[in-house]
Amino acid sequence: MEKRHIAVWIGLVLNLIFLGIIAYIPSALEPYRDQLDYQTQQLIEVLPYVKILMTGGIAAQLISLTFPRNQPKLGLIFAMIGGIIFVPLGFIFIVGYLYDYNRVVYSSLKSVPKLAQLPFEVLLKFNKQRQVSMAAMYAVLGVVLLVIGMDFGGIMVAVGIVLLINARRIQYYPMLAIAGDNLLFTPGQYAVCYEAPLSAFTVITDNRSALKLHIRTAELDRVFRIAKADLLQDEQNTLDKILARLKRPSVIQ
């Protein structure tokens, strides 16, 4: 089996532990059934069906790990199904799988290490503060919902934690950058930075909300999207310089 992101294994182990707890509770409480209140008795009745559903979720996660590199989309579908069944814990598995998915899709390109000291002509960074603000908003709202008794708050807290961890990670990668005749780009929140010739890119869409780029090389033909909300507010001029270079890749400014 090929190497996987550590979050995949952590997520899978946590989901298995949770499934074990769900399977154990009914047998542990059955001897005391007559002493339990009505709601707890109803919970004992429902948990076997939850166990079946979660067993299916684990099966979907395991199946997603068996797909070869030439079928990443199909593997991602199973990973999403299996992860969603286990939310909020399932988010850990999903995030790890998204890292692996992007790694496979862009495997033909050269990856750029964190904090790479390259002679950037133009550098566009992610808006870390926006990521942190969103993480805090989800976490605080989730805690409030949990306090008032709404279990959905747990999902929001989990999302907030994932966003916070990723905000710290993403600050070490450029969103877009130009070094020589190459474009460095991070194709998603859960991906690393890659490098390809400027001539391999075509601007598909450039509007107020998003930028879509088409990359075509001998091994890769793909469109990816960059949300402009992830840019710093004063970075439009920097983005314009990058777009100008993409339209005229041989011109050095």
Q: Could you describe each region identified by the protein language model?
A:
Residues M1-L12, D37-Q39, Y99-V143:
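N-terminal membrane-targeting/pre-transmembrane regions
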Residues R4-W9, P68-L76:
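Membrane-interfacial loop-to-transmembrane alpha-helix junctions, especially the N-terminal start
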Residues L16-P31, I44-N70, I81, F91-D100, ...:
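Alpha-helical transmembrane spans
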Residues D37-P48, I77:
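Membrane-interface segments at the starts/ends of alpha-helical transmembrane spans
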Residues G75-G83:
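Central hydrophobic cores of alpha-helical transmembrane segments
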Residues L163-E195:
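Conserved beta-hairpin
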Residues L183-L184, V192-K212:
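Phosphoinositide-dependent membrane-docking surfaces
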Residues K212-K241:
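Canonical phosphoinositide-binding patch of PH/PH-like domains
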